[in-house]
Amino acid sequence: MHYFFIIVIWLLSINTAWADCWLQAEKMFNIESELLYAIAQQESAMKPGAIGHNRDGSTDLGLMQINSFHMKRLKKMGISEKQLLQDPCISVIVGASILSDMMKIYGYSWEAVGAYNAGTSPKRSDIRKRYAKKIWENYRKLKGMSAEEKNKRLSIAANK
């Protein structure tokens, strides 16, 4: 599985203007592209080069605000901080991978969505719920759009 993931990341990195990265992430991880987009809206306001500094000293990088906690594993796969900041498709794929990991723990649920941001500690349950509620609002708005408007947004975000 790791080799497949590395190959996909490599393919995405050579074609950063690829507008279908949201749909590719959806297919790879069986997570709706609209849900991933809703997370990116909340995490970075759709800014691929976004950098967030956290109180615990960690840093969040890129469109999907990938926490520096994951960098040791990502570096072993050949993914750098620079790539997360400069290639939105890599950020989307990595974000989908992290959300998929949370879904292995919590199932396809809003608890898993909350864990994407707040982690799995039982002490952070309320934070997970608040975060999931924000994502739900973004997701609900996106699901209410016409297919044409939705495709336009997904395409624009992939090419930023």
Swiss-Prot record:
**Which domain of life does the protein's organism represent?**
Bacteria
- Signal among the record's keywords? yes
- Cite the InterPro entries for this sequence: Lysozyme-like_dom_sf, Transglycosylase_SLT_dom_1
Q: In the record, which residues are listed under signal peptide? A: 1-19
Q: Would the keyword Manganese be found if you checked this record's keyword annotation?
A: no
User: Listed disulfide bonds for this chain?
Assistant: none
Instruction: Write down the SUPFAM superfamilies for this protein, in alphabetical order.
Output: Lysozyme-like
Give the CDD domains listed for this entry: LT_IagB-like
> Which of UniProt's keywords are assigned here?
Signal, Virulence
Q: Write one Pfam family the protein is assigned to.
A: SLT
Protein family membership: Belongs to the IagB/IpgF/P19 family.
Q: What name does the UniProt record give this protein? A: Invasion protein IagB
Taxonomic classification: Bacteria, Pseudomonadati, Pseudomonadota, Gammaproteobacteria, Enterobacterales
